[in-house]
From Swiss-Prot:
Gene3D superfamilies: Hexapeptide repeat proteins, Spore Coat Polysaccharide Biosynthesis Protein SpsA, Chain A. PROSITE patterns: HEXAPEP_TRANSFERASES. Residues 275-422 are annotated as: Hexapeptide repeat domain. Disruption phenotype: Morpholino knockdown of both gmppaa and gmppab results in muscle damage and shortened motor neurons. One of its GO terms (biological process) is GDP-mannose biosynthetic process. Component of the GMPPA-GMPPB mannose-1-phosphate guanylyltransferase complex composed of 4 GMPPA subunits and 8 GMPPB subunits; the complex is organized into three layers, a central layer made up of 2 GMPPA dimers sandwiched between two layers each made up of 2 GMPPB dimers. This is Mannose-1-phosphate guanylyltransferase regulatory subunit alpha-B. It comes from Danio rerio. Pathway: Nucleotide-sugar biosynthesis; GDP-alpha-D-mannose biosynthesis; GDP-alpha-D-mannose from alpha-D-mannose 1-phosphate (GTP route): step 1/1. Keywords: GTP-binding, Nucleotide-binding, Nucleotidyltransferase, Transferase. CDD domains: M1P_guanylylT_A_like_N.
Length: 422
């Protein structure tokens, strides 16, 4: 028997995803036409003997989350429930807090994954790898290869090349340690809770001492990466399974467009029915495009590559859309152009208007390059990135919006470039 836990964070997390996370919890943001979390759940549902999927986070229960859980349970025929943390407890603290629920029924092992990663999720391969390495270890980490410079932005894993044992783990080192990075997808046995428990007890002692000595409240946080993996490395307790498949983080809104491209490409193998095709009376499709069945699109529009069109979207004649996500209820009027952008819910782009961003893709000449987590500002100016229109933004006709972020409910009356429009 197996279970899966997905860590979905909370409203204080994912701030780099604003203004899109104002309207919907980040894990429910649509990537390649379906909520981000659905890609995880689809992968979990394909694992034999998977009995339950748990979502752990500190969002208040809300209608969107409840609707998503209900529809996912109906579609995948597997129990899914949300466990709400009383505070942000960290990647290890959350699962330790709910250890009784996770261990109920006696699972032999459980998957743990972060919601903000995009991957092919090789869960079956990880399970087979786990079984090949015997009974005595307590976890398998999914790893991938990054280049030397970008590896410093991730948890770095030093492995024994013959046995794949994790010998050393450092979270975001200041100097180069290894080009194998942590993907945020794990397979644990119940033994992991004994190790988390030791750290939790030690932290409790330090917390009490700190409060007695200085009167400061310390959060009850246990971090898997810094507190658990670093301590267990080199003790034959952790192993790393290296994947050659695609993997990326989804930290910023710009990375959502890149993740959408990866998933749309994967649909050729997994869900070809989700990809739009060129047929009579339909818009011209170039490359991989997802179109919701309720969207109303003029046949003279040209879409793709890497375009996702949401529910109830209206697209007029002569419109060009490329490398973009168009969200629920948006209207693109005749002959407008949308490139490298996310158009928010119920927003309108006027006739002959142009909404354009700068792609934040990995270096195409480096096979191990990852997407850069750019800071919003650099050298006193806004870093050029994709353009984001928040919910219910109105772009008038013949206006150009380039490399800008527009917060929700704005009626613009002129062109903007490299600005955050509050």
């Amino acid at each position: 028997m197996l279970k899966a836990i997905i860590l979905i964070g909370g409203p204080q997390k994912g701030t780099r995803f604003r203004p899109l996370s104002f309207e919907v919890p980040k894990p429910l943001f649509p990537v390649a036409g379906v909520p981000m979390l659905q890609h995880h759940i689809e992968a979990c549902a394909q694992v034999p003997d998977m009995k339950e999927i748990m979502l752990i986070g500190f969002y208040q229960p809300n209608d969107e989350l409840n609707r998503f859980i209900y529809s996912a349970q109906q579609e995948f025929k597997i129990p899914i429930r949300y466990l709400q943390e009383f505070a942000a407890l960290g990647t290890g603290g959350g699962i330790y807090h709910f250890r009784d629920q996770i261990l109920s029924g006696g699972p032999a092992a459980f998957f743990l994954m972060n919601a903000d990663v995009c991957s092919e999720f090789p869960l079956l391969e990880m399970l087979q790898f786990h079984r090949q390495h015997g009974e005595n270890h307590c976890g398998v980490l999914l790893g991938t290869t990054a280049n030397r410079t970008q590896s410093l932005n991730y948890g770095c894993i030093v492995e024994n090349h013959e046995t794949n044992e994790v010998l050393h783990f450092v979270e975001k080192p200041s100097t180069f340690v290894s080009d194998i990075i942590n993907c945020g997808i794990y397979l644990f046995t119940p033994d992991i809770f004994a190790h988390i428990g030791k750290v939790f007890q030690r932290n409790q002692q330090e917390k009490i001492q700190e409060e007695l000595t200085h009167g400061r409240q310390m959060p009850e946080v246990v971090r898997l990466e810094q507190d658990i993996f670093t301590a267990l490395a080199g003790q034959k307790k952790l192993f790393v399974y290296k994947t050659q498949h695609f993997w990326s983080q989804i930290k910023s809104a710009g990375s959502a467009i890149y993740a959408s491209r990866l998933y749309l490409k994967q649909y050729h193998q997994t869900h070809p029915e989700r990809l739009a095709t060129n047929q009579g009376g339909t818009p011209k499709i170039t490359g991989d495009v997802y179109i919701h069945p309720t969207a109303n699109i003029d046949p003279s529009a040209v879409l793709g590559p890497n375009v996702s069109i949401g529910k109830g979207v209206t697209i007029g004649g002569g419109v060009r859309v490329r490398e973009s996500i168009i969200l629920h209820g948006a209207v693109l009027q005749d002959h407008c152009c949308v490139l490298n952008s996310i158009v928010g819910w119920d927003s309108t782009v006027g006739k002959w208007a142009r909404v354009e961003g700068t792609p934040s893709d990995p270096n195409p000449n480096d096979p191990y390059a990852k997407i850069d987590s750019e800071t919003l500002f650099r050298d006193g100016g806004l870093t050029p990135s994709i353009t984001i229109l928040g919910c219910n933004v109105n772009i008038p006709s013949e206006v150009i919006i380039r490399n800008s972020i527009v917060l929700p409910h704005k009626d613009l009356n002129r062109s903007f470039k490299n600005q955050i429009i509050l």
